[in-house]
Structures are given as C-alpha cells and as structure tokens.
C-alpha cells in the first residue's frame, strides 16, 4: 500500500474554515461598528488609540466623524484594508475580555489541532484579519485559550513571528508569493511541499498549490458554493477529521 504524503505544518484559514462565516459577518463586524462611536468620543486623543487613528489616510482621520464615515464605507464594501483590520482588532479586545465575544469553533477543529500537535506537527494561521485580531480569537474560543496549539517560534534571521500571518506580513491571500514567503520564514519546520493549507476559498487554495503547498477546500454550512469545475479540480473536505485519510500529519518528534 502506497504511503500517504507527509505533512509537517498545517496552515489554517479562519473564517469559514475553523469558525462559521456568520460569527465574523453577524457578530464581530456589527460589534466593531457599534463600539466605534463611543471609542471615538472617549479615546480620540488617547495614546492607546492614536496608532490606530494615525494609520488611516489624513483625509479620513481629521475628525471622529470622518473616520466613522470611512469605516462604515469600507465595511459596507467588505474591503480588507490593513488599517481597518487593525482597528477592528482594537475594538474587539474589550468585547473578548468582557466575555461578550467568544469564537465558536466547528466541533472537529480543536480535536484535530490537538492531535496534530501531539503528533509533532506545527500549526500556523493565515487570515485577512490582523495578527492581533487572530490572537484574540484563538485566546477567546468557546473551547478556551488555544494559543498553545499554534506555533509561536520566531525566525531569528528575519525576525518574523512564525505562527500568525495576515495580509501585512505575508501579502494577499490569493497570491502564491504570500505562501512562499510564509514557508520560507518557517523553513526550519519543513519544505514547502510538507505544508498543508486549509481554506474555504478556492482562489486561496489555488494560490497555495501554485507555491508548492498541499491545499484542500474546506466545505462548511454557510460557505460559498464550490463550482462543479472546481469540485473536479480540488480536494474537498467537510471536516478536519477527513484530512488524515489523504495525508499523514506528523512532525520530526513523532
């Protein structure tokens, strides 16, 4: 019997892959919009808020009203602008800390992550949400604080924190060069062909495969439909439990 391909590193998307799209669209985004007016009113000149305000273009950060209007426009268009993502993470912090926000993971996610880590594999995250927002989400899940499951090594040569990636430190998720950069920064963990990227987005899966990574499309309730053409081209899974039917997820220490 032919041995299954080996995977040393699993790279995970978040929205639609480990948690429902509805948590982001219907819970996190509305929370940020609702919290923003009071934050602008009470923290406009505060040292903690200034870095987020200063990241916005001058024409949109001259007054609280201008910034609020710009944020509403960006979110209405679902644009993934880095300075917007950073601000959202700042706004979500209090919601997570107060217990108002808690990320509901799909039931197969944590057991799979736990098993992969126990087998010596490494787990990394790549999302359009900022690294700060990613860390909040994994800290405050319905399963508890799962940051310990995620690789937190630092590549000394490039001074990049290896476990969390977004569109700022990696690049756009539909470009193969972004996946090449992630694998190169963590080259001690395994060759690019020993990485597996899991995402609900077919275009991201294509880009990851172009870089040399393995990649599967994750099909979840509430996700966009996958075309018949792509179903014939891609490997589709409906649960992380299906991953090890196709690859062996294990690290050097296993």
UniProtKB/Swiss-Prot annotation:
**This protein's pathway:** Amino-acid biosynthesis; L-methionine biosynthesis via salvage pathway; L-methionine from S-methyl-5-thio-alpha-D-ribose 1-phosphate: step 3/6; Amino-acid biosynthesis; L-methionine biosynthesis via salvage pathway; L-methionine from S-methyl-5-thio-alpha-D-ribose 1-phosphate: step 4/6
Instruction: Please write the reaction equations for the catalytic activity of this protein.
Output: 5-methylsulfanyl-2,3-dioxopentyl phosphate + H2O = 1,2-dihydroxy-5-(methylsulfanyl)pent-1-en-3-one + phosphate
Q: What is this protein called?
A: Enolase-phosphatase E1
Cofactor(s) recorded for this entry are: Mg(2+)
Q: What is its EC number?
A: 3.1.3.77
Q: What is known about its subunit structure? A: Monomer.
Q: What is the lineage of its organism?
A: Eukaryota, Fungi, Dikarya, Ascomycota, Pezizomycotina
Q: Which residues take part in binding Mg(2+)?
A: 13, 15, 200
Q: Which organism is it from?
A: Sclerotinia sclerotiorum (strain ATCC 18683 / 1980 / Ss-1) (White mold)
């Amino acid at each position: 019997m032919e041995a299954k391909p080996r995977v040393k590193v699993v790279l995970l998307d978040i929205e639609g892959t480990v948690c429902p799209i509805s948590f982001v669209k219907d819970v996190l985004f509305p929370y940020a919009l609702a919290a923003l007016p009071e934050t602008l009113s009470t923290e406009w000149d505060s040292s903690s808020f200034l870095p987020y305000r200063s990241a916005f273009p001058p024409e949109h950060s001259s007054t609280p009203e201008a910034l609020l209007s710009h944020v509403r426009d960006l979110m209405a268009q679902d644009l993934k602008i880095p300075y917007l993502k950073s601000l959202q993470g700042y706004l979500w912090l209090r919601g997570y800390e107060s217990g108002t926000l808690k990320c509901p993971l799909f039931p197969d996610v944590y057991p799979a992550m736990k098993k992969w880590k126990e087998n010596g594999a490494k787990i990394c995250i790549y999302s359009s949400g900022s690294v700060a927002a990613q860390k909040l989400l994994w800290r405050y899940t319905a399963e508890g604080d799962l940051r310990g499951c995620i690789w937190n090594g630092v590549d000394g040569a490039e001074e990049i924190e290896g476990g969390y990636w977004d569109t700022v430190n990696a690049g756009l998720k539909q470009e193969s060069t972004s996946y090449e950069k992630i694998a190169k920064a963590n080259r001690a963990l395994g060759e690019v062909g020993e990485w597996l990227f899991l995402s609900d987005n077919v275009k991201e899966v294509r880009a990851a495969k172009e870089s040399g990574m393995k990649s599967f499309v994750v099909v979840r309730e509430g996700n966009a439909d996958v075309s018949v053409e792509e179903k014939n081209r891609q490997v589709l899974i409906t649960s992380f439990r299906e991953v090890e039917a196709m690859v062996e997820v294990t690290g050097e220490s296993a």
